[in-house]
Structure formats: structure tokens, C-alpha cells
């Protein structure tokens, strides 16, 4: 499969996921460390193996190390956009892990 065909399929799949789940999915190209061609490096010097998932520190999202067309990527899964209705306020969730942190607290007058 060509790279452009892979990207089109990914966009279609991601679009379907966003429409039905109200979440978000993104991809970040990763440059592997020398001698570790099948591992995604993270900020603190550790690496994630292909298929390994972890919570992104300080954010309400998780990342998974994936490989497509001989390139490494982080697949980032997050909450998407939430809105409170008229007369309501939205507050960040107190949960610390994804996806539980995606559910905001809503208070209405």
C-alpha cells in the first residue's frame, strides 16, 4: 500500500472515530534513537516499544508507539472538544488518567 493511500485511510478512520466518540486522535512523527529502530523515545529518555501505550504526563491523553510504512509515530488519543450548555459552567475533571479525565464537571444555574 502506498503512503498516500495509507494516509487517506487513516484520515477516514480518524474522522469516523471523532464523529462517533467525540474524542480526538492525532499522529506525531517520531525519530528513533540510534540502535533502537523499533522504539519511540519519550521526553525523559525512556522508550516505548511498538504497541506500548502510556498516559502523557500532565495531559489528558495517552500515546501509543506505532509503525507505519517503516516510520515510527505516536498515536495520540485525547478528549476532543466539550462545551457546556446555556447557563452552565464546565470545570476540568479531577481524574488523572485518560479517558476518565475527559469527563468534565458541569454546573448549571
Swiss-Prot record:
Tissue expression per record: Expressed by the venom gland.
UniProt cross-references to Pfam families, sorted A to Z: SVWC (PF15430)
Protein modification: Contains 4 disulfide bonds.
Location within or outside the cell: Secreted
Sorted UniProt keywords: Disulfide bond, Secreted, Signal, Toxin
Signal peptide interval: 1-23
Gene Ontology MF, one: toxin activity
Alphabetized InterPro entries for the sequence: SVWC_dom (IPR029277), Vago-like (IPR053308)
Lineage top rank: taxon: Eukaryota
GO CC annotation: extracellular region
Family of this protein: Belongs to the scoloptoxin-16 family.
Protein name as it appears in the record: U-scoloptoxin(16)-Ssd1a
Amino acid at each position: 500500500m502506498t503512503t498516500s493511500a495509507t494516509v487517506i485511510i487513516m484520515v477516514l478512520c480518524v474522522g469516523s472515530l471523532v464523529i462517533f466518540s467525540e474524542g480526538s486522535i492525532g499522529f506525531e512523527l517520531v525519530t528513533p534513537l540510534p540502535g533502537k529502530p523499533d522504539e519511540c523515545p519519550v521526553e525523559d529518555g525512556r522508550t516505548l516499544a511498538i504497541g506500548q501505550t502510556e498516559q502523557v504526563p500532565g495531559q489528558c491523553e495517552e500515546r501509543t508507539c506505532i509503525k507505519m510504512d517503516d516510520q515510527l509515530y505516536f498515536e495520540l488519543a485525547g478528549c476532543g472538544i466539550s462545551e457546556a450548555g446555556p447557563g452552565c459552567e464546565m470545570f476540568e475533571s479531577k481524574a488523572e488518567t485518560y479517558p476518565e479525565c475527559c469527563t468534565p464537571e458541569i454546573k448549571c444555574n
